[in-house]
Amino acid sequence: MKAGVAQQRSLLELAKLDAELTRIAHRATHLPQRAAYQQVQAEHNAANDRMAALRIAAEDLDGQVSRFESEIDAVRKRGDRDRSLLTSGATDAKQLADLQHELDSLQRRQASLEDALLEVLERREELQAQQTAESRALQALRADLAAAQQALDEALAEIDQARHQHSSQRDMLTATLDPELAGLYERQRAGGGPGAGRLQGHRCGACRIEIGRGELAQISAAAEDEVVRCPECGAILLRLEGFEE
């Protein structure tokens, strides 16, 4: 296969564009803005989980408050009924003693329930303070998350612009190449490595491996427009004297 100096130079430019596109793709998956966003997102999710746990705990305490208040109300009504019976004078001595005993028990029960209710209300107040603090932290994290998302979007937009620019240049450059030469280059790239590299002294510019003397002599003896390949990696070797990358 033959490739004139102009074609070789275009191929070298194509290899440089592909290398830059590879670097752009790597940057897109290793953006510091992405890591920052993921960190804030993790903190935001953790705060959401804490808020959910606090809400569940608050609902449980609210249920306890309702139960205690209901029990206290029932005890109070029972006590009011017993006191009405005591003051009615329509009971005998034994009934009076039983009523008084029940009233004493109800008073102790009411006092115990009210103490328990007070303890739950105190816990509920502490929980409300935690919810308030967590809500403020969550609001701050929402703002941080929005800022991190914007920074990531801007970085991705910049990368997309660079990718589009280099891809457009690549398309235009590929159109100028001999189809057979372009096909060889693409097949080499499909193997996972660079499709072409400049011969730099004794070293292949694609794989950076030094070429043996015997093989280098064969490469040097080939015609200037003869397409030669690296004996190590198979990349097209571009022999371009005086051409700066």
UniProtKB/Swiss-Prot annotation:
Q: Which UniProt keywords apply?
A: Coiled coil
Q: What is this protein called?
A: Uncharacterized protein Rv2229c
- Cross-referenced Pfam families, in alphabetical order? CT398_CC, Zn_ribbon_9
Q: Where are the coiled-coil regions?
A: 33-176
Please provide, in alphabetical order, the Gene Ontology terms of the cellular component aspect for this entry.
Answer: peptidoglycan-based cell wall; plasma membrane
Family annotation (InterPro entries)? CT398_CC_hairpin, Oxidative_Scav/Glycosyltrans, Zf-RING_7
Q: Does the keyword Coiled coil apply?
A: yes
The domain of life for this entry's organism is Bacteria
